[in-house]
Amino acid sequence: MNNLDKQYQELLLDIIQNGSKKSDRTGTGTISVFGRQIRHKMSEGFPLLTTKKMAWKSLVTELLWFLRGDTNIKYLLENNCHIWNGDAYKNYKSQVPDEVKEFSSQSNLNLSMQDFIQRILEDSDFAKKWGDLGPVYGAQWRKWDSKERIVIGHNGMYNEFGTIVIDQISKLINDLKTNPDSRRLMVSAWNVDELDKMVLPPCHYGFQVYTTELTYQERYKIWFSRNYETGMEYNESTTPDFDNSYYDPTPTRKISLMWNQRSVDSFLGLPFNIASYGLLLEIIAREVNMVPDELIGNLGDVHLYSNHLEQAKEQIMRKPFNLPILEISLGEPSIIESPENWSPSDFIVKNYESHNTIKAPLSN
C-alpha cells in the first residue's frame, strides 16, 4: 500500500477543510494550517508521489546543486531546471532602477524573463552578477561563514585575514562515521546573519539524522537481498556469523532523517521537498554504509495558495500507484566529496507509475 500519497492527500484535505485565510508576501493569498507532520518508511518504496507526475530530473539537479555548494542558477539552467528562475529574475528587476529600465534597453538592462535566462546562459559576467541568489542552501550547507577571523597569509609587514568556513555536510558524514549515536547530527541553513543577503530565506531550514543498530536478523536479511543466488531461500531462523568477513560490508546501522520547514507550499513545493530529502537520506546512507529507515517532515505554516485549490481537489480524488524504487549508480567517487562528478542520470527511479501532471502557477 502507498501510504505516502494517502498522507499527502489527507494533508491537502485538512488544509481545505480547516485552513484559515491568510495574506502572504506574494499577494496571492493562502489558506493555512500550522504544525503538521509527514512520516514515511523508506522500506515501503522511494517517496516520489504518484498522484501527479513529478519532475524527477529537476528535483535531482537541485539537490546536486545544493551539495555542490552552488548558489548560481546557471548550473540549474544548463540542466534544464527552472525552479529558481522566478526568484533570480525578481531580484534582477528589483535592483535595476526604473529610470535605467526605461532608457537603457539597448544595453540589455531591461530584459524579459526569457531574455534574462538566455543571457545567464550565454554571458558569464552577467551570470556572475545576476544569476547568484546570495548565500542560500548550498552556501550554508557547504560553506557556512563562521565570521571567525584567522591569518591566511602575509603581505610584507601585514597579515592577511580570512574567515573559517564550515562544511556542514562533510562534518555530518565524519560524525556519522565516528560517533553515530551523537545527538548533534544536524545541518542548518538558517544563518541569521546572512538572511538579508539571500533572495529568499530558507523554507526548509534544517535537518537532523538519527541512527540505531540493526539486529543480526535485519543484517542477514539485508545481506541476503543483496547477495542471494538462484535457488537460495531466505530462512528467518538462521543466525549468521557476522564475525566472518564473508558478510562484510553488510551495514550495521539504519539511519533516519527529519527535516524542519517553516513555510510549506503544499501543492507545488512539498512533493519536491519530500522526494528531495528522501534522496538526501539515500545519499547519506550510501556514504556511511547504513540502511535508510524513516523520513520525517516537521511542517510549520502549511498552506495552499488560493490559485491552487482546484488543482489540490483534483489530486485528492486520484488513486495512488505503488511507489517506485531508487537506484544509484555504483560509481566510486563519493557523492558528498565529488558532487561535480555526478549527474541526474546517475539516479534512477524504477517502476515509477503516476497520474498526469497538474499544472499550477508559481507565486514568487
Residue map of PLM features:
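Terminal, non-catalytic protein-protein interaction segments that mediate quaternary/complex assembly
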Residues: 1-364
